[in-house]
Amino acid sequence: MKNWITKQTANVKSDILSGLTVALALVPEAVAFAFVAGVDPLVGLYAAFMIGLITSIFGGRPGMISGATGALAVVMVSLVAKGNAMGAPGENLGLYFLFATVILMGIIQMLAGLFKLGKFVRLIPHPVMMGFVNGLAIVIFLSQVGMFKENIKDAFGNNKIETHSTEQAMYIQDAKVYDSNTNVFLFAKSNSDLINPVNQAVIYQIEGNQVFDATSKEVKFNIEDNEIFNVEKTGISKQFLPRNELLLMLGLVLLTMGIMFGFSKYLKQAPEALIAILVVSGIAIFANLDVATVGSFIKDGGGEGLKGGLPSFQFELFSKIPFNWETIKFILPYSLILAAIGLIESLMTLNLVDELTETRGNSNRECLAQGGANIITGLFGGMGGCAMIGQS
């Protein structure tokens, strides 16, 4: 027992500092991946907290970090959007479908561990491993380009929404708006306003090639050559920061990288990444530099900031989602894809850490830990996750 305690506490200082570094690095990533998936930032933070904690205790590879990841988030976008479309506006049904999908994803991953399928990762050729690592590096680099951009505002001061035209809904002829299917007269057009002909109330306003609800200022349609189309929202319009702000941000990025790589041999007592984060954050705060923060990033994305408590059991999941064959048919394909991506990324990361440390992890145990973590995360309101090669 004494030897076990001695072994576990031999590097306690390095472990604490490394854990602090990873925690600070995970916050903005979890927030960003939550926005990618189309859910609240806290859903991403809950996933980072629960996945990371559970896999670190029960996983099969010491030194491997898990949390919300971009590879899973890009698959979740479609799931959340389709789920929301199945419910009433504002019901947020897509979020609950996401939780159910993550639970089923975890069950599939645990089955992979029980049937000892994790060992097959050893059969992956080395060139494939290198391609995986370099591909992820490119994806991570490209994902950072968005940090050098700012949201474009529309005519009403809100974030400008990018839209894609779908089917035609209405058309304009002789200053009158008609339904495209029935040719019924709907609105009168006066300048940029679409007016209810009965009570003369302004219902919609035209700004550029978009039609906005006059009350909520939310984009509802696209307009092209007197034809009005329904829309599919694809994101928030962005542009690169103004020159001075862009140069300031680039300077801080280069300073951070310089501390991490240029002074690594002088920073033996603490992780270089932690020192870089603390030093550059201190400069930005005490010099009162006008730069984006995690909080402002959340608000720019439509959130309200980092406000919330610990994750709680999602009792609403069982009343919101009908657990029948139709639900299974909807979430099963997403669960299979997410489970496969999560296990492949986790086991390839495990294999890479094995090579770096010249030790051997337990791939089947990692499958069980990843699956169990995702089940608990889904039940407690997280978006699920897997191993993160960058942090590991």
Feature locations, PLM:
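Transmembrane helical cores of multi-pass ion-transport proteins
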Residues: 1-185, 189-201, 207-392
